């Protein structure tokens, strides 16, 4: 079943929405029945979606971890932002 890959604005997508679109792209490319030009277009969109997901994951990670500094100010590890 072919699904249309829309060229909408990636930056407004949630992590889950972007991941779902990325899964559709991978499925279409793995099937191998997509014309070459379309494969290139959807591959490029897949790269943009992957980068968007990476960015969102880094933001989430920054919210839950805080860098621990040693006495001389150098980083020595991370700890939960709000330990309970």
From Swiss-Prot:
**Subcellular location(s) of the protein:** Cytoplasm
Q: Give an example GO molecular function.
A: exodeoxyribonuclease VII activity
**What is the protein name given in its UniProt record?**
Exodeoxyribonuclease 7 small subunit
Example GO CC term: the record gives: cytosol
- Using the chain's own numbering, where are the disulfide bonds? none
Key word Repeat present: no
Function statement: Bidirectionally degrades single-stranded DNA into large acid-insoluble oligonucleotides, which are then degraded further into small acid-soluble oligonucleotides.
Task: Check the record and name the SUPFAM superfamilies matching this protein.
Answer: XseB-like
Q: Which family does it belong to?
A: Belongs to the XseB family.
Record-listed E.C. numbers = 3.1.11.6
Say which domain of life the source belongs to. Bacteria
Q: How does it assemble?
A: Heterooligomer composed of large and small subunits.
């Amino acid at each position: 079943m072919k699904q249309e890959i829309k060229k909408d604005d990636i930056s407004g997508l949630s992590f889950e929405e972007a991941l779902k679109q990325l899964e559709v792209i991978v499925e279409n490319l793995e099937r191998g029945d997509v014309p070459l030009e379309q494969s290139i277009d959807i591959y490029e969109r897949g790269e943009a979606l992957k980068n968007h997901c990476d960015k969102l994951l880094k933001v989430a990670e920054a919210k839950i971890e805080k860098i621990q500094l040693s006495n001389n100010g150098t980083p020595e590890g991370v700890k939960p932002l709000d330990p309970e």
